[in-house]
Curated annotation (Swiss-Prot):
The gene is speE. Keywords: Cytoplasm, Polyamine biosynthesis, Spermidine biosynthesis, Transferase. Belongs to the spermidine/spermine synthase family. GO terms for molecular function: spermidine synthase activity. CDD domains: AdoMet_MTases. It comes from the Bacteria. This is Polyamine aminopropyltransferase. It comes from Shigella boydii serotype 18 (strain CDC 3083-94 / BS512). It is found in: Cytoplasm. Homodimer or homotetramer. Catalyzes the irreversible transfer of a propylamine group from the amino donor S-adenosylmethioninamine (decarboxy-AdoMet) to putrescine (1,4-diaminobutane) to yield spermidine.
């Protein structure tokens, strides 16, 4: 039997992961980017950009459930949600499951990303693009948060790593804009990489966010294809009580929501804010 082609991730120089490629569904390599979607027997459809896995059908639910349900249930009565990025539609899918949310705005810099993902990753959006509460805005995320007249209860930054096009979503200009259009007691969250390998990302985000929010921290989860340990999510708000809600309060909100999740549950919610000592020490050692 012929040996299967392998795709190797290039995120780190000294080690990494590979996937057997059963079938290439799409591959575009230009001077600006290298985008591929292929099928793998273990992880389903895999999308990678510039040599780095962005999402897989098998484990995306962990990332998207934790990015949405943690801030939305901590807030408790979010009506207006902003998603920056998220063109694959999975973040939108999870937000639409909250029936008390009245409007969902998604800002994507490239309209082609949405149509592309609708075609090649239909399980990610699961029809959520057709939700009547959803509005798509084609714009740069930094520009939008600094110019919009809308305000939001929860802002979710579904950004790539802080290199290339995703770098602007880790800047002070972006964080300042998010603070500008966030309602009182609103919550901002963003992915911040695998902290064991990308600790400087967390430190940098913590330092910048602390200029604009009184309560800044992280919560975490483990996602198989984002290897190297736990992935951290930045958390920023001016209501410090929201990060310390009891499991009983979250449980009551969870039951009232009617959510049925594959990863998230109220115990996971409260436990996610417990961080490893090496990250706590790194954050504490930074000048204020």
């Amino acid at each position: 039997m012929a040996e299967k082609k392998q795709w190797h991730e290039t995120l780190h120089d000294q080690f990494g992961q590979y996937f057997a490629v059963d079938n290439v569904l799409y591959h575009e390599k230009t001077d600006h980017q290298d985008l591929i979607i292929f099928e793998n027997a273990a992880f389903g459809r895999v999308m990678a950009l510039d040599g780095v896995v962005q999402t897989t059908e098998r484990d995306e639910f962990i990332y998207h459930e934790m990015m949405t349900h943690v801030p939305l249930l901590a807030h408790g009565h979010a009506k207006h949600v902003l998603i920056i990025g998220g063109g694959d539609g999975a973040m939108l899918r999870e937000v639409t499951r909250h029936k008390n949310v009245e409007s969902i705005t998604m800002v994507e810099i490239d309209a082609g990303v949405v149509s592309f993902c609708r075609q090649y990753l239909p399980n990610h959006n699961a029809g959520s693009y057709d939700d009547p509460r959803f509005k798509l805005v084609i714009d740069d995320g930094v520009n939008f948060v600094n110019q919009t007249s809308q305000t939001f209860d929860v802002i979710i930054s579904d950004c790539t790593d802080p290199i290339g096009p995703g770098e602007s979503l880790f800047t002070s200009a972006f964080y300042e804009g998010c603070k500008r259009c966030l309602n009182p007691s609103g919550i901002f969250v963003a992915q911040n990489g695998v902290c064991f390998l990308q600790q400087e990302e967390a430190i940098d985000s913590h330092r910048k966010l602390s200029h604009y929010f009184s309560d800044v921290g992280f919560y975490q989860t483990a996602i198989p294809t984002y290897y190297g340990g736990i992935m951290t999510f930045a958390w920023a708000t001016d209501n410090d009580a929201l990060r310390h809600l009891s499991t009983e309060i979250i449980q009551a909100r969870f039951l009232a929501s009617g959510l049925k999740c594959r990863y998230y549950n109220p115990a996971i919610h409260t436990a996610a804010f417990a961080l490893p000592q090496y990250l706590q020490d790194a954050l504490a050692s930074q000048p204020s």
